[in-house]
């Protein structure tokens, strides 16, 4: 599993015959090895030599409730089985019967939810005389409704986490944009990749491939994407390729561990995306060109290495181009168009990795990306079980009245004037749109506390107090929009 499926090569066999033993990196303690804690070896181990200590002694497999669901810790959309007992999260396993990703999970999807140790918000809170105090749901909604009505709607801002379901994103947009006409409805964070893919679709239509292209590829050009840290299971699909046969062109902002797996590689640390695209374009047919020579002169030894490697482009049978958040920016749109035209000329498949779990759906619904977190008299923050974004926290410090719907007490909650308790991922059902266009269902696995509510439930309550009803048909909105990939 470690080598053949994950491509990490941490585990191996030492000694022979009856003395052979499973070891990590030449027999060092597992915690000191190159193990990435994905847990896939633990799940498939047939003997029990490797076990999950967090779920030990919490019951037999038949004592647990199994809920087939989807991972929402990135936009890849791996399938997983959430295992619970007595309304407690016991363990998360990969769905070995799934057709995508061989049932693999990474540390984020398997262990991070189980390790969650933040303090839950269990009741609505309001800040009075500098201190947070309990308040009833009805009173909390009255306070929020009064604040929204007391100000010019165009000055109000509303932000939401990309971890929210499509249902919650759609209701959020319907409430704040369609009904309240607020000045800004946006996702947290700086990632523009989903919005970029939609802009490119206006000219090129459904130009993207699904993640299955990674399995078929014999060469990859990766521009501004970190598959190891941000999308580990997608990284597994490349890491397990034979390093001496697979061709890798890797252009990143910072050092990238994926390069260590391949000998036939060009690694450029920096944002030389346009130069690399020009090199590729020059080599779509055999031979050289003046532009290539000019780039080589400008870039020096690294570019000469690129020149030698890119001469092999003609031998690539199934190349894939992977674009990430460091390159997929609206300011790079024209360069990206040049890349798409090149890919169509040479038959290369293109995948744009799309930020947070549901940022693709959010962009299709019309939510803004990379917002300016400036001052506003009232701001609504639908965070859910997401983590505090420093950019957003800094923006909150300059704001007016702050309404925060969150599952946990964190930096957002410390700045809030009203805190509304939110359900976590396992406590509500909802749909998610993956980076390659699959609409998947996250099934409820836990029963929430009596005070926890979803974003949609909170906004429905506010709509009732404001005298209007919410009408949100997310299926029609998402599927009718021009998309960079055919939605499934």
Regions found by a protein language model. Name each.
Residues 189-487:
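Non-catalytic alpha/beta scaffold blocks inside enzyme catalytic domains
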Residues 1-294, 464, 468:
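N-terminal export/assembly segments and adjacent metallocofactor-ligating motifs
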């Amino acid at each position: 599993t470690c080598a053949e499926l994950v491509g990490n090569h941490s585990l191996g066999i030492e000694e022979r015959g009856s003395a052979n033993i499973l070891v990590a990196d030449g027999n060092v303690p597992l915690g000191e090895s190159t193990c990435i804690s994905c847990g896939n070896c633990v799940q498939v181990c047939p003997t029990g030599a490797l076990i999950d200590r967090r779920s030990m002694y919490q019951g037999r497999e038949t004592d647990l409730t199994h809920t087939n669901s989807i991972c929402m810790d990135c936009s890849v959309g791996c399938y997983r089985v959430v295992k619970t007992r007595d309304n407690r999260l016991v363990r998360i396993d990969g769905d070995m019967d799934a057709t995508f990703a061989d049932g693999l999970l990474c540390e984020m999807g398997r262990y991070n939810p189980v390790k969650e140790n933040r303090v839950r918000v269990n009741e609505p809170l309001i800040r009075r005389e500098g201190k947070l105090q309990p308040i009833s749901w009805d009173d909390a909604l009255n306070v929020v409704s009064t604040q929204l009505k007391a100000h010019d709607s165009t000055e109000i801002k509303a932000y939401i986490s990309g971890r929210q379901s499509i249902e919650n994103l759609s209701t959020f947009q319907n409430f704040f944009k369609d009904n309240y006409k607020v000045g800004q409805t946006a996702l947290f964070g700086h990632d523009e990749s989903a919005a970029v893919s939609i802009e490119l679709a206006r000219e090129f239509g459904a130009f993207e491939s699904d993640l299955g292209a990674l399995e078929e590829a014999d060469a990859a050009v990766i521009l501004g994407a970190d598959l190891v840290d941000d999308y580990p299971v997608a990284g597994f699909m490349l890491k397990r390729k034979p390093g001496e046969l697979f061709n890798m062109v890797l252009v990143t902002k910072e050092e990238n561990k994926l390069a260590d797996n391949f000998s036939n590689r060009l690694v450029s640390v920096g944002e030389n995306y346009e130069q690399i695209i020009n090199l590729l374009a020059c080599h779509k047919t055999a031979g050289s060109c003046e532009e290539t020579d000019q780039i080589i002169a400008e870039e020096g030894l690294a570019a000469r290495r690129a020149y030698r490697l890119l001469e092999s482009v003609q031998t690539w049978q199934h190349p894939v181009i992977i674009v990430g958040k460091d390159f997929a920016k609206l300011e790079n749109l024209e360069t990206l168009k040049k890349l798409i035209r090149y890919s169509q000329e040479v038959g290369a498949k293109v995948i744009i990795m799309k930020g947070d779990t549901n940022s693709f759906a959010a962009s299709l619904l019309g939510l803004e990306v990379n917002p300016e977190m400036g001052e506003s008299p009232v701001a609504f923050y639908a965070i859910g079980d997401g983590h505090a974004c420093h950019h957003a926290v800094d923006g909150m410090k300059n704001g007016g009245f702050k309404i925060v719907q969150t599952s946990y007490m964190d930096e957002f909650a410390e700045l809030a004037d009203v805190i509304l308790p939110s359900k976590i991922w396992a406590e509500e059902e909802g749909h998610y749109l993956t980076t390659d266009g699959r609409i998947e269902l996250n099934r409820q696995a836990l029963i929430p506390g009596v005070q926890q509510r979803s974003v949609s439930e909170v906004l429905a309550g506010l709509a009732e107090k404001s005298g209007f009803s919410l009408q949100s048909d997310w299926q029609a909105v998402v599927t009718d929009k021009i998309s960079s990939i055919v939605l499934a």
